[in-house]
């Protein structure tokens, strides 16, 4: 932060000296405050647009600690099998399907409000096509997480309205619009890959102005979103995924998308406050596989074991939970992961499994695992990929209250069909392998893990022991979405009621209805039983 301040002090001094040297102009120029940067000077430095660009980047994976906690640690993280709460005074929480009114607003209203001020400032305040492309891309990166969490959301009407209390779009309409915006951004970025990095570097905490890398991220995001539609709109999913792959996705860890903030504030959440510990689910899988990445990602508990907290329990002692369950490894200089090469390669593997070559799918699957090992600095990927004996471990609660048998018997090595009769079953098991390994590789992206769990049914997760939903959630299937904030009922009720009707109309293969956590969103339609 001090470096940035010094840089701007130099800029301001230069501009002030420039103003003093040019004081022979008209009266306005003579009387201008020479220590103040003008609009023209800020435009020349890309300052006004650049600061809004930084603001949008800070929301893709929220860097503000409270916003991060509500979006990832308290909702997406638990539902994705990554994180469980240790606080013994939280009796109303997402994990037990009874979040308080205050909790419900954070992943929805707070994200939307924070996004649209800088977004509109760019699209309405500049004619720079690259800046507008960045704004469109980042809005999609932020808002696809919101629609994936809720279903129908306000989207198309927000750009032209001052109020955030507007009509909702169906999730299908949101995805359609987002693909249009991604395609527009990809086309513009593709024409500007030789733009000097200096044009954006001071405002870019991800790729430091490298447009070619941003293009890979945009195509990777398109691939993620395309595969999200694999069950609800298979033809669209296949076409959009093919376009993304052809356009060039992230294939090397050097191109991973991660936000380098001045400080990673999740250290407060996990290290200082101790409000959360690693979830039992991910450590059951990794313990069972004797996964070498485990010690690179997590800390052992007070007796040297890697063991997670069961998600959705009634915690009786925070201090005991903090010591008995493993924490994640995070430091103040840890970047906020957005998208890594392993995820893009696993998505490509699934594309090949569904619509291409099974042999290519196998190659990509193994390549993705190796990329993840490389990213974590772990060795032993080759041995890991051929060990057909190890399976996910049962859960043994160090406090003795919530132990459970393993939910899956999936092994790591790719499986080849031995005859035509078992092709479909083998393909499904290989899909489970892809999703489980991707789940391990993208930690701690909780919202994404939860979305893929809902889409595919994998990884198979432990049910919550404490269900306070009043029957509005099928505990075996887990939470399918988040409920809308109370403020929407109070300030935007007519539009909200229409959205709830749309939510129900879009649902397929669901067994709950209405604005509850058990209702399925549009793309969550796989008819599976856990």
Please place each PLM-identified region on the residue numbering.
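Short capping/connector residues at structural and topological boundaries
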Residues: 35, 42, 158-160, 255, ...
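Beta-strand acidic-aromatic groove motif in beta-rich domains, primarily in extracellular
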Residues: 65-74, 152-153, 238, 451
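C-terminal functional modules
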Residues: 386-530
């Amino acid at each position: 932060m001090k470096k940035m301040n010094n840089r701007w002090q130099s800029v301001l001094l230069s501009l002030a000296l420039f103003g003093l040297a040019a004081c022979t102009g008209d009266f306005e120029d003579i009387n201008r405050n020479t220590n103040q940067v003008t609009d023209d000077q800020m435009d020349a430095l890309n300052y006004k647009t650049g600061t809004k660009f930084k603001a949008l980047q800070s929301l893709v994976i929220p860097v503000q600690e409270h916003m991060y906690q509500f979006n990832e640690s308290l909702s997406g993280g638990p539902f994705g099998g990554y994180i469980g709460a240790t606080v013994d005074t939280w009796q109303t929480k997402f994990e037990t399907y009874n979040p308080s009114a205050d909790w419900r607003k954070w992943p929805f209203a707070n994200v939307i409000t924070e996004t649209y001020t800088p977004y509109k400032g760019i699209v309405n305040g500049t004619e720079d096509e690259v800046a507008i492309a960045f704004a469109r891309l980042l809005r999609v990166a932020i808002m696809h997480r919101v629609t994936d969490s809720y279903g129908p959301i306000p989207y198309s009407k927000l750009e032209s309205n001052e109020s955030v209390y507007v009509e909702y779009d169906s999730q299908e309409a949101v995805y359609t619009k987002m693909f249009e915006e991604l395609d527009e951004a990809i086309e513009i970025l593709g024409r500007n890959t030789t733009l000097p990095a200096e044009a954006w570097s001071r405002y870019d905490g991800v790729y430091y102005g490298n447009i070619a890398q941003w293009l890979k991220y945009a195509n990777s995001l398109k691939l993620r979103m395309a595969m999200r539609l694999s069950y609800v709109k298979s033809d669209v999913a296949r076409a959009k995924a093919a376009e993304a792959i052809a356009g060039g996705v992230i294939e090397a860890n050097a191109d991973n998308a991660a936000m380098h903030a001045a400080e990673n504030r999740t250290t407060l959440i996990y290290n200082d406050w101790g409000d959360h510990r690693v979830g039992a689910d991910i450590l059951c899988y990794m313990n069972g596989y004797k996964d070498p990445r485990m010690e690179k990602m997590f800390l052992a508990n007070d007796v040297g074991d890697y063991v997670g907290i069961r998600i959705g329990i009634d915690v009786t002692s925070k201090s005991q939970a903090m010591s008995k369950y493993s924490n994640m490894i995070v430091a103040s200089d840890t970047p906020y992961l957005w998208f890594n090469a392993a995820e893009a390669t696993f998505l490509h593997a699934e594309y090949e499994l569904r619509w291409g070559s099974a042999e290519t799918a196998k190659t990509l699957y193994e390549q993705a695992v190796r990329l993840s090992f490389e990213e974590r600095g772990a060795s032993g990927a080759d041995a890991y990929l051929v060990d057909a004996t190890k399976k996910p471990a049962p859960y043994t609660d160090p406090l003795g209250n919530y132990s459970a048998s393993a939910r899956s018997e999936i092994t790591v090595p790719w499986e080849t069909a031995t005859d035509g009769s078992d092709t479909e079953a083998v393909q499904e098991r290989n899909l489970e392998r892809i999703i489980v390994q991707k789940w391990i590789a993208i930690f701690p992206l909780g919202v994404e893990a939860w979305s893929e769990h809902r889409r595919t049914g994998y990884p198979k997760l432990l049910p919550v022991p404490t269900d306070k939903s009043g029957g509005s959630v099928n505990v075996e299937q887990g939470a399918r979405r988040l409920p809308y904030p109370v403020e929407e009922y109070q300030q935007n009720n007519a539009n909200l009621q229409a959205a709830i009707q749309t939510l129900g109309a879009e649902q397929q293969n669901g067994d709950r209805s209405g604005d509850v956590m058990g209702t399925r969103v549009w793309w969550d339609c796989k008819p599976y039983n856990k």
